[in-house]
Amino acid sequence: MEFHIRANQAPGKLAILPGAFNPPTRAHLAMAESALTVVDEVLFVLPRAFPHKEYSGAGFDIRMELLRAALGGNPRFSLASSDRGLFIELALEARDDYGADTQLSVLCGRDAAERIVSWDYGGGDNIERQLEVFDLLVAARSGHYDPPPPIRNRITSIALPAGVEEISSSEVRQRIRAGEPWHDLVPAPVARLIEQRMEFWLSG
């Protein structure tokens, strides 16, 4: 894991927010800010490769530039990149960097939580074993998440402000390509950078 922005103080509780961030949206920031009510620091992680998708449109360097702008100097936000992509891999990397005394959570939306719980890990660590390393913080996006009883005590739901639950990166890209309004879906610094690199959003 390579840090690009590092918060100053060692957190007792850390939330890891992995994503493709294509582009970062107001929903990403709202998730992180809501998580700060229960953790000390949020670590945004942009993988250099993804387990279930490939890079298209804006590349790694541009997305990292957008993330730097989106975080806006919040002293409780950190930013890192990783050659890994699975939640358990990122959590173990964070454990190496933050130490055994830091309580780890992975922050995600309901759709991602449902995927990780049901994913076939091919004989590797199942979700119960992974949740021995980290908890899940699940933002109530696109409906409430009701986790299976065996892992319910390792999953915490966090609320999002009204109006951001349905915002997604794919919606931003679709609106840009369709010539529809999109600026209110992303932080203002991100919108300015997108305007400067519009060719990546019109093609990807």
Where on the chain are the PLM-derived regions?
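Nucleotidyltransferase catalytic core that binds NTPs
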Residues: M1-G204
